[in-house]
Swiss-Prot record:
Pfam families assigned: PapZ_C, RapZ-like_N
Phylogenetic lineage: Bacteria, Bacillati, Bacillota, Bacilli, Lactobacillales
Binding site for GTP: D63, M64, R65, S66
Organism: Streptococcus uberis (strain ATCC BAA-854 / 0140J)
Residues annotated as binding ATP: G13, M14, S15, G16, A17, G18, K19, T20
Keywords attached to this entry: ATP-binding, GTP-binding, Nucleotide-binding
Family from the record: Belongs to the RapZ-like family.
Cross-referenced PANTHER family: RNASE ADAPTER PROTEIN RAPZ
InterPro entries in the record: P-loop_NTPase, RapZ-like, RapZ-like_N, RapZ_C
Protein name: Nucleotide-binding protein SUB0630
Function: Displays ATPase and GTPase activities.
Length: 296
């Protein structure tokens, strides 16, 4: 069996250009990530990944900390190319001098290469030292006019191995309004206007996952009309959320107790969405009433 290659992205560039946002984006894409790794430790780390880790997608932030940085990283890149089954790319993040100065003023942090505290001097020195590495980089991104969200979007577009599955998934959940709206919900839909199976004794103890309840909820015209509009709303916007670099979209559907109507709707929606996107289906309050009755 051929050995699976390591997919290595080395994230570097100007201090203040967005490396922290970048490494978080790679983590959302499913990469194994480490921030601020000394170049000399990279080969040993890759050896461990090669032998012991199923995840062969790795992103490392390697910062400029000394004048010997370029010499070190060049030697390391040659070494790993010779000794490992690896595909590696360098992502270089840049920004204009004025933008970098503005960011340092905003955060009130000192530049790592500004010995006398003058940020512009540190930027000029760093730019000079990194120029050869920038010329070697396969991906150069100017973040001067990018928001953090836009930078995440750029990284997603350039490094996601699968635009649907690697970087984005959907959580479809049901809940009961009487227990509170889920705090992590991105989209919330209310189905309390639909006929309630709770008032039918033969359905009261069942849930929306039981066929009898599901059929009762979905047999009404207003249920099917609402579901049609719900799908027409949700499916077209999912690519937009994925494009924005969002890794998880939580869609919450609520009824009064979270046992019947919302469960049926969440299940139906999950079955529809999973045809095109990775989906996790959950029902937060489905058994809450039963648990309350048992405790009383």
């Amino acid at each position: 069996m051929s050995q699976k290659k390591i997919d290595l992205v080395i994230v570097t560039g100007m201090s203040g250009a967005g490396k922290t946002v970048a490494i978080q984006s790679f983590e959302d894409l499913g990469y194994f990530t480490i921030d601020n790794m000394p170049p000399t430790l990279v080969p040993k780390f890759l050896e461990i990944i090669e032998q012991n880790n199923d995840n062969k997608r790795v992103a490392l932030v390697v910062d400029m900390r000394s004048r010997t940085f370029f010499k070190e990283i060049t030697l390391i890149l040659d070494q790993i190319e010779q000794n490992f089954a690896i595909d590696f790319r360098i992502l270089f993040l840049d920004a204009t001098d004025n933008e970098l100065v503005s960011r340092y003023k905003e955060t009130r942090r000192s530049h790592p290469l500004a010995a006398d505290g003058r940020v512009m001097d540190g930027i000029k020195l760093e730019r000079e030292l990194l120029a050869p590495l920038k010329s070697m980089s396969q991906n150069v991104v100017d973040t001067s006019d990018l928001t953090p969200r836009q930078l995440r979007q750029v990284i997603t577009e350039q490094f996601s191995s699968d635009s649907n599955s690697a970087s984005f998934r959907v959580e479809v959940m049901s809940f009961g309004f009487k227990y509170g709206i889920p705090l992590d919900a991105d989209l919330v839909f209310d189905v309390r206007f639909l006929p309630n199976p709770y008032y039918l004794p033969e359905l009261r103890e069942k849930t929306g996952l039981d066929q009898e309840v599901y059929d009762y909820v979905m047999k009404h015209q207003e249920s099917n009309d609402f579901y049609k509009h719900l799908v027409e709303l949700i499916l077209p916007i999912l690519p937009g959320y994925q494009k924005e670099g969002k890794s998880l979209l939580t869609i919450a559907i609520g009824c009064t107790g979270g046992q019947h109507r919302s469960v049926a709707f969440a299940h139906r929606l999950a079955e529809t969405v999973k045809k095109d996107w990775p989906v996790n289906e959950s029902h937060r309050d489905k058994d809450k009433r039963k648990e309350t009755v048992n405790r009383s």
